[in-house]
Amino acid sequence: MQLNFAKYQAAGNDFIIIDNFQDQHYTYSPVLTKQLCHRQFGIGADGIISIEKKAGYDFALLHYNADGSQGRGLCGNGSRSALHYAQVLGIIDQKAYFNAIDGAHIGCIHNELVDLTLQDVNSIQPLASGYFLNNGTRHYVEMVDSIDLIHMEVVGFPKRNMYPFEKEGININFAQLIAPDAIQIRTCECGLDAEPLSCGTGAVASALVASSYYGLNSPVKVSTKGGKLQVTFTRLPDGRFIDIHLVGPVYQSFYGIVHPASLLPIVAYNPL
């Protein structure tokens, strides 16, 4: 069996995009997913996005994490990358109505710039030293003064299983105000063993927290290690957020063909 794929990145958040809409059929396997995403023993990526057929939609997206697990929430940058690839494949033109794990979304493509709508956010709740919200994915956001001083391995990753998310986990974001209309963020995600260069839904979550508690108005510019994103929204008097959009460029790195049977098992480094 051979598997055709496209490699994409959006603000450095990289994905293997698989066309399950047309001829081939990728069957989810935790072991194979982990192998494909491994940066030494596979193609290398933060995750896999599969484009699927679904009645009533232009297409549906399935998301798998680099650790082999299935995504439990919306993947913002992965969805934007898949939107671009769906246009390349001729599945859509410039606009799409598609389904993800959290429900229906609309995406618009203007060359490399891809605009993704997200679900309304009805509340942002204080939690520990930060705030919790769900924008299709659970996020914890903590505002800090010096984001570059954060040691993710020590401070960030352990918080992914903080109370009350010990079992299912939660994505952790640190955000710093850098201008009256801009923030800088870093994220550690469930399903990833290393800090990604960006996280789309994390950018949105951080922008909404900055708006709700620090007065930033739409649009909010978000800087990440991998590039810049923009978040637009309407903030209602009761604190709810509607008409939420994540906007930014996506880039196709390359096409490829992989023969899964030829992949070597992932082995742990064993120094002599």
Q: Model features per residue range: what roles?
A:
Residues 1-111, 133, 141-272:
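A glycine-rich beta-to-alpha transition motif near the start of alpha/beta enzyme domains, typified by
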Residues 116-129, 150-159:
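Active-site glycine-rich loop that binds ribose-phosphate moieties when present
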